[in-house]
Design a protein with these regions (language model features):
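Long, low-complexity intrinsically disordered regions
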Residues: 1-263
């Protein structure tokens, strides 16, 4: 087993935490995403960050928020999404890029969230069922068809996006120039996999979250164990024994209050 210092050194290399490993091109950024499996936009945890790997001066050094984004490479996050990689808000409401392989791990959870949210709230159910009938729809069309104001639709869609039930896609029109988004249900943007054969649904989702956590720890190389519970939105699927189970099953290893993927 590697020491924590050795793992952190490997993390610095694989997650491009040093200026000598800075991303130089969009193609290089896409290879970085495919290697890691998932990327956050900005640094907020041990999960690898696209903008951190750019090592570029901020757009507006004196300004918080967007001003701290890389001066010229900030569009790369959206451009990678335009190349077919999913951008999801399942990092507790923050956007995350994921590859198809990680999307497959997310699939049973996101499909379960569609069903749960349809049962939980009639307004959520109305939007989800409308998208099921109409297909992926632009915001303006949804406002008209559902009789909603822009702020009402924004408030309605936010929790659905946070849980992975719906997925937005940015659209830019040139003539006349305008920006909008298209909303789709998760099951309209990812083909999914065969259903489990008769297993207990709650147990299956517990295992799915475990699979996702292993992939996320692999992306990070090594991470403080206390962080893992805060990485994804679905606290209701979390069990405090989950990490113990993954260690017992030989999928994760503990190293000085951190975890890494077992060798």
């Amino acid at each position: 087993m590697q020491t924590l210092a050795e793992l952190q050194e490997r993390r610095a290399y694989e997650c491009r935490l040093t200026p000598g490993r800075a991303l130089e091109t969009l193609n290089e950024a896409e290879r970085f995403l495919c290697d890691r499996g998932l990327l956050t936009r900005t640094t907020d945890s041990a999960l690898p960050s696209l903008f951190e790997a750019c090592h570029e001066e901020p757009y507006a050094p004196e300004s918080p928020g967007f001003g701290q984004w890389p001066a010229t490479k900030f569009p790369w996050f959206g451009k990678l999404g335009a190349r077919g990689h999913h951008i999801l808000a399942v990092h507790r409401g923050k956007n995350m890029l994921v590859t198809d392989a990680v999307a497959t791990l997310l699939d049973p959870i996101c499909r379960a969230e569609i069903e749960r949210m349809e049962r939980t709230d009639p307004d959520w159910a109305r939007l989800l069922r409308h998208l099921a009938r109409a297909g992926p729809s632009e915001l303006e069309d949804l406002q008209t068809e559902l009789g909603l104001k822009a702020k009402e639709l924004k408030k309605l869609r936010a929790p659905l996006e946070r849980c992975g039930a719906i997925v937005p896609r940015s659209i830019v029109y040139e003539q006349p120039h305008r920006h909008t988004s298209e909303l789709a249900r998760w099951d309209q943007v990812h083909s999914g996999r065969a259903d489990a054969d008769g297993g207990d649904a709650e147990t299956d989702l517990h295992h799915s979250l475990g699979d996702l956590l292993v992939a996320a720890v692999r992306a990070a190389v090594v991470a403080p164990e206390r962080e893992l519970k805060r990485w994804f939105s679905w606290q209701w699927y979390w069990d405090d024994l989950l990490v113990d189970e993954l260690v017992h099953d030989g999928r994760l290893e503990r190293v000085d209050d951190h975890v890494t993927v077992a060798e």
